[in-house]
Amino acid sequence: LLSTLTDTSIKEAVATDKAP
């Protein structure tokens, strides 16, 4: 669960970083 939650958080952070 923790691993999945962290992975999702990382993906969201990357998406936000790539957003204009």
From Swiss-Prot:
On the 2D-gel the determined pI of this unknown protein is: 4.8, its MW is: 15.4 kDa. This is Unknown protein from 2D-PAGE. It comes from Nicotiana tabacum.
